[in-house]
Amino acid sequence: AIHELGHAVVGMVCKHHSKMTKVVINLSAPRSPAYTIFENPPNNFLTRENLFEHLMVLLSGRIAEETFYDISVTTGAINDFEEALKLAEKMVCYYGMGKNVIYPSLSDKYKEIIDLEVSTLIHEAYQQAEFVIHNFKELIVEGSEILKQEKVLTSETLMEVINNKYRHLYENMSNIKFCK
């Protein structure tokens, strides 16, 4: 539940990311015992901000685990990491959304630059998501308790909790530009 609330809360704070619709927990499902559903993007033209914030959301489940569990992280975030790496590589290599314009080449120098750009992008997204998670620790705990009890947590329910207890923090956080 904590892992999924990490995704949900970071997704709700990010103004360029598709909005979260619900979080579901179903421990009897063998492949995916919990998942967070987001709306589809409104169009096919995604900006660097959209994709950067998606990186943040992908990494936030793992960050929530690290923050709340007194153990090392689990293997539950492997799919999120694979997807984050693929997305960061696409952002740099195909979409030209890295810090530098990279021209295709087979040289080792070119590969080094790509690795550095991808690593930097993931590191920056990780730091930004970690900032959000640490600021919303109480909300994540509260939301995970609702999810464990109800098995489904809708965006409306989470927003109700935010409005009742965390409105000022949410409004301040929603004004931050995460993608630099």
Per-segment meaning from a language model:
Residues 1-180:
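Soluble catalytic regions of large protease machineries
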